[in-house]
Amino acid sequence: MILQAAGLGLGAAGTGIMMPESVNAAAADFNDISKWPGSTDEAQSSFEQATSYNNFYELGTDKGDPVKNADKLVTEPWTVEVGGECEKGGKYALEDILKPHAFEERVYRLRCVEAWSMVIPWVGFPLADLLKRFEPNSKAKYVEFKTILDPANLPGQKFPVLQWPYSEGLRIDEAMHPLTLMAVGLYGKELPGQSGAPLRLVVPWKYGFKSIKSIVSINFVEKEPKTSWNVSAPREYGFYSNVNPEVSHPRWSQAKERRLDSKSSGFSALFSEKRETEMFNGYADEVAGLYAGLDLRENF
C-alpha cells in the first residue's frame, strides 16, 4: 500500500528467514532508496526481533500480541486529519501525504522506557518536510498526534488500559528537528501492522512510546497537549520522556539497558549483561541544545 501510494515500484519480498504469516504481511520491498549518512553502524536487531517483540497496546498488552493480532489493523483506506494552528489543514489521503517525499533508510537506536533497546533500519522522511507543507502559524508551539481509534477491530481498545485514542505530542522545535522521522517502513519493507502501519513517528532520542504508531491525526496547538501515558501515570511518564540515564523511572533504573541485536539469538539478549545507557540515547550532540536551561529532572 505504501509503495503504491508513493508511486514507487515493487520488488521481490524474500528475506531468507522463516517468519509467522503475520510478520511476512509486510510484503513489498522498497527499491533504490538512499542511505542516510548519519546512520549508526552498531549491530542491528534482527527483523524477527523488531517485528515480534513490540509494545502496541491497541493490539494487546503482551509483547507477542501485536504480531498475532496485526491483521486486525485495517489500513486501507487510510487518511490523516490535519488541523489546528495551520493554514492548510484538512483530511488527506495517505497517497497525498506521501507522494511529494523521497524516502531514505536511517538506522537509529531505539530505547524503550522498559530498559531494553534495539537498532532498527527505518524507511521514511523527515517529519519537518511534511509539517511545513501544512504551513503552521506562529501560535503552533506543539504538535499533537493521535493513533487510529477502532475498538470494533483492535482488541486492546476494548479495554480501558489507556485513554483511547492513543495520543502523543512534541514541541514544534522537536517535531521540526532533522532527526525526527516519519516512518513508512523498516528493513527495506513496508511497516507491518505490529510496527505501526502505515505511518508512525520515530524520535530516536526519546523513549519508544513517544514514537506514536498508526497516525490518523496531526494537530498544531498552542499549549502542551495531553499524552496518553502521562495522563495514565503522570509520576512515571513525563511529557518530554527524553532518554536520560540520570533520571530513574519510579520503579526501575534507567542507567542501563539490554540490547536486542543480531549478536544475540532470538530474544536471549533480554537475559544478557546490560550496557550503559547514553544521554539522549546517544544523540546528545544533535539535540541537547533543544533543552538548554531546562531542568531535565523536573521536565522528565
Give residue ranges: language-model regions.
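N-terminal export signals
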Residues: 1-22
